[in-house]
Amino acid sequence: MDEFREASSVSSSPSTPLRTPLHSPNLFNGDFSVSNRFSFKSSSDYSLSSSFSNGLCSPEDSSSPFSSPPFNGIIPKHNHTSSSPVSFDSLFFKDHEKSHVNGTDDLGLCEDLYRMNIKEDVEEDQIRYARTETLKDPLPKSDHTDFTPDPLYNFSPKHYEPSNGGFVSGGFPYGFFRPPKESSINQSCASWSGFDQSKNDDKRNMFGNNPQQFGWPSYSSSNSGTSPYNNGQEIFENRGGMREYSAYSPPHQPEVSYKHQNYRTTTSDILPLFCQRTQVPMVSKCSEPFSSDESFFMNGKSIDHQRSNTRALMSNNGNPTEICHPSLPNMCDIQGYVYLMAKDQHGCRFLQRIFDEGTSVDAMIIFNEVIAHVVELMMDPFGNYLMQKLLDVCTEEQRTQIVLVATEEPGQLIRISLNAYGTRVVQRLVETIRSGKQISLVKLALRPGFLDLIKDLNGNHVIQRCLQCLSTEDNKFIFDAATKFCTEIATHRHGCCVLQKCIAYSMRQQREKLIAEISRNSLLLAQDPFGNYAVQFVIELRIPSAVAMMLAQLKGHYVQLSMQKFSSHMVERCLMHCPESRPQIVRELVSVPHFDQLLQDPYANFVIQAALAATKGPLHASLVEVIRPHSILRNNPYCKRIFSRNLLKK
């Protein structure tokens, strides 16, 4: 920009004409062969404001910058060679006297040409760019699907190999389409690129005949027909040039003109979406939209509904063309690939679509190919969704066969349940099993690993699903194990939650055993970060025998428990739900020699507030009588809650 500003200032001086790149001898210090064609127009054809926008203008006559003598010469072609490196220091500036010898410059140009407007012959190309060509013929239809271009999908010139997400150009998944057996597109590469080769020859780079040396595009003049498939990797590729068909072209790019003949595609030309990397979501019309990244499991959603929501219209010579999803291919085409498809992000969705829309024969083909890989697919990031779907739609005999394979080896079902993906399938298995044989096999497989399952982040959900879906009798093995390992389970992060579920779903003797075991260990559990929840749960049940046993365990320890973070919650729960515990708790609190320490304790102050709210009559008065002498502590961060409320006036 600085060079152009300096050039502009020079052009305003009549004594120093503007030096264009062609006037600088330093520009041609390298071994270059120059062959350029330019069109020249008089400066008088342009206004002062447009002289630099349309070309380079340099008047020498200050009185009339627009006047110029007529041009009567022809530009000679010269070859300039030099061993010195190319220098651009004098691109626009050169001494006028040294540059002009006998009225000519280094290139042999007459001085009168300095006042001419020099510009490239781009007007015809601009007209060519501005002209919009409509599609002469629609894309051919096949027996399988309408293969009409969608304006939302761009057939870009880039090649996307499997390492780039499993896509080739055009947005189609790599490997999804096999090259058609008979296909041809009689299309001139020149019309693909939108440029005339004869014009392109006129625009060679000034430094040589290599059009790409300084970034100019190259266009081939080959008129040979092209195929929409190039070794199964490129769709509508222009083999002779850099430009390809784009469903949407910006205003500055030429539109496409093409014809198609003898193009046919059958269902046998379809390959499944597998054996490719699947990090990049599909953008072709063959994929089904999902609302979230986790929605790999298609729960009974018909593909007809999705197809109706993805219609699109585009103008083709004024005729609307409908674009829709292709129909499902014949299962014979994907037979032998189902196992690999099940482990693919898009393949598992495709197979789920077959379950929704296909026949029982199609489901049988899928089942027969995955039954030998049940364990692996259950723990696969994508295969687990297919297994969940299969458990929903399969027959009882098929479900029994799945259970037999999953429980064939000892500890195998436990290992699946501990897996982040496998736990989903095992939970779905528990939901769908009906026969006694299926339930018995699952129970026998889970029983040895009960303690590991109940403590695991993933495995504990399998136990909870058993409690929800199986009968009380079938869950007896869970209740017995929970009673046996009650303390160990109650003091675990995940186990304490499952233990509460066990109490909620158990009946009669099993429930009594669990509650009795918690009550006997209430003092220990009350001080545990997780065990205190089990004690609070039993207190809220208000079972007299359990409460009596628990209060006997806690008697004499209320002051100590009130000053601890976790057990203080349990003491508050006793004051709220166990009226028989209130006198004992209040007596122990007021008998403390240094009661002011309880008032200022970060946890005990909550117990005192709960005692003031829960007690009445003489019991409440005895507590207030101990609190009033310490009113000086009302500004204490913990005590002010006691004195600021109306608890003392109750």
Swiss-Prot record:
GO terms for molecular function: mRNA binding. One of its GO terms (biological process) is regulation of translation. Disulfide bonds: none annotated. Residues 8-22, 217-232 have a biased composition (Low complexity). Keywords: Chloroplast, Cytoplasm, Plastid, Repeat, RNA-binding, Transit peptide, Translation regulation. Residues 308-650 form the PUM-HD domain. Pumilio repeats lie at residues 333-368, 369-404, 408-443, 445-480, 481-516, 517-552, 553-591, 594-625. PROSITE patterns: PUM, PUM_HD. Its main location: plastid. InterPro entries: ARM-like, ARM-type_fold, PUM-HD, Pumilio_RNA-bd, Pumilio_RNA-bd_rpt. It is found in: Plastid, Chloroplast; Cytoplasm. GO terms for cellular component: chloroplast; cytoplasm. Residues 1-22, 200-235 are annotated as: Disordered. Residues 1-77 form a transit peptide. The pumilio repeats mediate the association with RNA by packing together to form a right-handed superhelix that approximates a half donut. The number as well as the specific sequence of the repeats determine the specificity for target mRNAs. Sequence-specific RNA-binding protein that regulates translation and mRNA stability by binding the 3'-UTR of target mRNAs. This is Putative pumilio homolog 7, chloroplastic.
